[in-house]
């Protein structure tokens, strides 16, 4: 029998995976914006992508982690909606369109959907960690964390809805 994962370790790994993905995406955007110069080894964007890459190599693909976490959390939860599951994981209250996007039943038949749910759990973990560290962040930094996390959650919800409405079941 396999012992359950340490929740603190799982959360720290999720936060590391989410922040690595965000940093890689930001570096990739900067690289593209710089055009041909962005791909030179000395450029800031290219250096940022290179700095993020080792985590992906040594820790394995983030998608595998997100899928496993989602299956663990969905399997142990009694919540039937995505918003309920994320609230159970400590998501602060959200309103408006984001709340409407999350008021959907949890669909577990697709690996891609489970990866998205795991990623959302990681975003909530990052958000909760920032809120639980008020002495570490200034109020404007906490507001930025909230904005980024809400934007990331909305993007994941939109991708989930698109997959469900387009009938995409690959994964």
Regions found by a protein language model. Name each.
Residues 1-171:
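Flavin-dependent oxidoreductase catalytic core characteristic
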